[in-house]
UniProtKB/Swiss-Prot annotation:
GO terms for molecular function: metal ion binding; threonine-type endopeptidase activity. A double ring-shaped homohexamer of HslV is capped on each side by a ring-shaped HslU homohexamer. The assembly of the HslU/HslV complex is dependent on binding of ATP. Protease subunit of a proteasome-like degradation complex believed to be a general protein degrading machinery. The active site is at T6. Its EC number is 3.4.25.2. PANTHER family: ATP-DEPENDENT PROTEASE SUBUNIT HSLV (PTHR32194:SF0), METALLOPROTEASE TLDD (PTHR32194). This is ATP-dependent protease subunit HslV.
Amino acid sequence: MELHATTIFAVQHDGKAAMAGDGQVTLGESVVMKHTAKKVRRLFHDKVIAGFAGSVADAFTLFEKFEAKLNEYNGNLERASVELAQQWRSDSVLRKLEAMLIVMDKDTLLLVSGTGEVIEPDDGILAIGSGGNYALAAGRALKRHNGGQMEAKDIARHALEIASEICVFTNDHITVEEL
């Protein structure tokens, strides 16, 4: 059985960028192994935020690879993401990794997947993991209808809270990072 980590949400709003992740790690389909995992991290001199969903061991491998690419390309988020995606897709060992990453800096928000995809959303919102669709819907509604009264970090936190009320693989122990 593998350990899985679940929901990550990221938003760009009013010149700020925020990412939130829940703390639940699940063994298989029925056992919660940890409630306080930190799946959102600051990288490259605190200028980049990255979050993962999927197999925990695979995600740590990808974090290391991504951080190495960030350092190699002097913090250029887009270049580091494309290079990681190319390596991930072409390397026979990396190709077996079961995780996804959301990475962001103040200006750019990207989804990086093992199929070689690097996707920048049109609306400045991304979510991944088992509760991703719930968080995405909640975040879009919050940004669209309350965006004038909320900061990016608040949208991120509330989107994850709503997802945790619906998805059994997402809890309400939420980590939020903001740029």
